[in-house]
Design a protein with these regions (language model features):
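Fungal secretory targeting signals
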Residues: 1-24, 131
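All-alpha RGS (Regulator of G-protein Signaling) helical domain and cognate RGS-like helical scaffolds
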Residues: 21-463
């Protein structure tokens, strides 16, 4: 039978395929592609614990001819204020829709290799960081049982997320190893200051904090702009990891408006103590290891009242929380009260802050000259005198508070009341508390100018 509809179909002829029709969803099958193996081999590290091997044959940071005791401060460059910044175009366009200026925009093909010692040593310390994260995430899953994670509020989906973060680190380690070439640092063995899931998660969120900040500090100083682009795309993932660990810990996920960037020596100071040993002929680093700093009343996110603490860390440097002295009913995991309970969640907020302006913070520090890092082959060192100030380094700010009652490698100070902009307390989140002998004016782009006056570096759990 010829119907009106079928007549239309006949008239359209070859265009009939354009007429929409209802279909059942199906799965599109494609032949599997061959997996691409990482160029850098990844091994399961069987040894975890402090180094107990022979004395190192090489000690101290890598060094060559030193031209001056520090980089002298200088005024802004001659062109720092020359651009009018008026919204108008002030140069010819090199191509349509392309403003004049920029770096790496002249059409030269990127090669993604380091160009200077600064580039190499910066990428190398970042690779040391990727290796420890790869091991740490796997280690936690292998060490603690499903029921251990469940007791901390972390179920199978959370554990798989942790597994996926470890897989991300395979990609990061491969990328940076390929950039550096055959001399790239290899995976080491490690020693973690934790004994349960809550301590483990706290250590992870602190480790990823200084890993993230350590890259932000040098990223825009690299000579190899193309390498910086790849590293940016890697560290952006790590920023997400750090926030996830805060959520796992029941902390507010992102309590700051800006993330801080720190010098490489700060990152290496905080990382090296957790590396037990590295393979023979491992590439060594130039960066400084500052003496250890202990925060005696470091806020403890595992407590219902996290600021009411004394000596509840598993050690210096990251000053990771300890649950050892938390009694029955004192853990925030045991509370059902909103604002106190710290079970994992997308977001949480505490009725009692972990820290606050005016809080006394008690400190102790080690003498320099201590063996630290892989095979105990690095030595802590400082060019600063006796500490006189605490530098609170967070977001865009470096704010100093005077140390009080300085004696016998100990002192106390008071948390300052300072904001980046109105409504944003600068002292918040997982931040840096740095001991110095002077108040040096520095800003985010030249923070390393503070290093000659730094005695020691620690992480402070402000929020």
């Amino acid at each position: 039978m010829f119907t009106k509809f079928s007549g239309v179909i006949a008239l359209l002829g070859g265009l009939t395929s354009a007429i929409p029709f209802v279909s059942t969803p199906t799965t599109t099958l494609s032949p599997p592609s061959a997996p691409v193996s990482p160029d850098e081999p990844v091994t399961d590290v069987a040894s975890h614990g402090p180094y107990n091997g022979p004395s190192p044959t090489t000690t101290g940071a890598l060094s060559t001819n030193v031209l001056a005791p520090s980089v002298p401060a200088a005024p802004p460059g001659p062109d720092a204020y020359s651009y009018p910044s008026d919204g108008q175009l002030h140069g010819a366009e090199p191509a349509p829709y392309t403003p004049s200026g920029g770096l790496g925009t002249n059409g030269s093909a990127p090669v993604y290799r380091v160009l200077t010692d600064f580039d190499y040593q910066s990428i190398a310390v970042a690779l040391y960081q990727e290796w420890i994260e790869l091991d740490l995430f796997h280690w936690g899953l292998a060490t603690f049982s499903d029921s251990d994670f469940q007791a901390a509020g972390l179920g199978p989906y959370d554990r798989y997320l942790l597994q996926f973060m470890a897989e991300q680190e395979v990609g990061h380690a491969t990328l940076l190893s390929n950039i550096l070439g055959p001399s790239a640092p290899s995976q080491c063995t490690y020693n973690y200051p934790v004994s349960n899931v809550h301590e483990y998660i706290d250590f992870c969120q602190k480790l990823t904090r200084f890993g993230e900040s350590g890259v932000y500090g040098f990223l825009n100083h690299l000579n190899a702009r193309d390498v910086g682009q790849l590293l940016l795309q890697s560290i952006s993932t790590e920023a997400r990891q750090q926030m996830i660990f805060r959520q796992f810990e029941g902390l507010f996920p992102m309590p700051v408006w800006f993330e801080v960037g720190t010098p490489q020596s700060w990152a290496w100071t905080l990382l090296a103590p957790y590396i037990s040993s590295c393979p023979e002929n491992q590439t060594r680093l130039i960066w400084q290891n500052f003496p250890a700093v202990y925060i005696l009343n470091q806020p403890n996110p595992a407590r219902a009242n996290g600021s009411d603490v004394w000596n509840e860390t598993t050690g210096p440097w990251t000053n990771t929380l300890s649950t050892q002295d938390i009694g029955q009913g004192e853990s925030c995991l045991d509370s059902d009260t909103p604002g106190v309970n710290c079970m994992p969640g997308i977001t949480k907020n505490r009725s009692q802050p972990l820290s606050y302006p005016g809080r006394q913070v008690f400190l102790r520090w080690d003498d320099p000259g201590q063996a630290v890092g892989p095979n105990n082959s690095y030595v802590t060192n400082t060019t600063a005198g006796i500490p006189a100030f605490a530098a609170w380094v967070s977001q865009l700010n470096v704010t100093y508070s005077a140390l009080q009652d300085v004696a016998n490698n100990s002192a106390w100070t008071v948390q300052p009341n300072v904001s980046t902009f109105a409504g944003d307390p600068a002292v918040n989140g997982t931040m840096y508390l740095v001991l110095t002998d002077e108040e040096v004016y520095v800003t985010p782009f030249n923070l390393s100018m503070l290093n000659p006056r730094v005695y020691g570096v620690a992480l402070y759990q402000a929020g």
